[in-house]
């Protein structure tokens, strides 16, 4: 059986380490390389408190790293400042990037799409790899047909750099597809402290919480006459994301276009 050759960018981070561990457990995948600016020179096995694997962690990702390892897929869990550069490196090397790092804006995505069109190499971007989170968004979209008054609270660990989360923005996008334009709240509402009502996207308020002890959580709260409905998803550990990431790696290896969202791989 031909194995999918996977390179992990950001392998020294919490998500990166979990991805590496999970790839090592897959019969149809082979870890061929890893990069992390803070762990350069270390064996990836040593980083995971395992026996050496003979894979030395490189510094910031370069095209040469991907070509030398003959990777099929580059999984990226770095930071918003590095993810676009890493995606460009992957596409230039003929490697399909699977991007889990959030923080890409519309201009970044447009640039990636143009490069995909030029190189004919596929790419995959997911705001969230948790299958439960995808279902939460689907359920919220269905509920919005009947409960148009809605707000979102997303809660993450205090080291997350971007706000609101990509999942919250994607949830608004899905809800807006079925929700008629609506001005919520009192027309004369005002904030005593700027930002008290959160960010407003398409008339839906998003509130971002950043605290230690949290991983990734989201509530979509609907209000109606005499009733309220809350749809919530909790990621209780980073293992939450592994089934979705492995699914994405398997599916992305067959791509020749840009695909955004894990929902595209769910039957």
From Swiss-Prot:
GO terms for biological process: diaminopimelate biosynthetic process; lysine biosynthetic process via diaminopimelate. Pathway: Amino-acid biosynthesis; L-lysine biosynthesis via DAP pathway; (S)-tetrahydrodipicolinate from L-aspartate: step 4/4. One of its GO terms (molecular function) is oxidoreductase activity, acting on CH or CH2 groups, NAD or NADP as acceptor. GO terms for cellular component: cytosol. It is found in: Cytoplasm. Signal peptide: none annotated. NAD(+) binds at residues 10-15, 100-102, 126-129. The keyword Transcription does not apply. It is an enzyme of class 1 (oxidoreductase). Its EC number is 1.17.1.8. (S)-2,3,4,5-tetrahydrodipicolinate binds at residues 157, 166-167. Keywords: Amino-acid biosynthesis, Cytoplasm, Diaminopimelate biosynthesis, Lysine biosynthesis, NAD, NADP, Oxidoreductase. The active site is at 156 (proton donor/acceptor), 160 (proton donor). It comes from the Bacteria. CDD domains: DHDPR_N. It catalyses: (S)-2,3,4,5-tetrahydrodipicolinate + NAD(+) + H2O = (2S,4S)-4-hydroxy-2,3,4,5-tetrahydrodipicolinate + NADH + H(+); (S)-2,3,4,5-tetrahydrodipicolinate + NADP(+) + H2O = (2S,4S)-4-hydroxy-2,3,4,5-tetrahydrodipicolinate + NADPH + H(+). Pfam families: DapB_C, DapB_N. Catalyzes the conversion of 4-hydroxy-tetrahydrodipicolinate (HTPA) to tetrahydrodipicolinate. HAMAP family: DapB (MF_00102). NCBIfam families: dapB. PANTHER family: 4-HYDROXY-TETRAHYDRODIPICOLINATE REDUCTASE 1, CHLOROPLASTIC-RELATED, DIHYDRODIPICOLINATE REDUCTASE. Belongs to the DapB family. This is 4-hydroxy-tetrahydrodipicolinate reductase. It comes from Desulfitobacterium hafniense (strain Y51). The lineage of its organism: Bacteria, Bacillati, Bacillota, Clostridia, Eubacteriales. The gene is dapB.
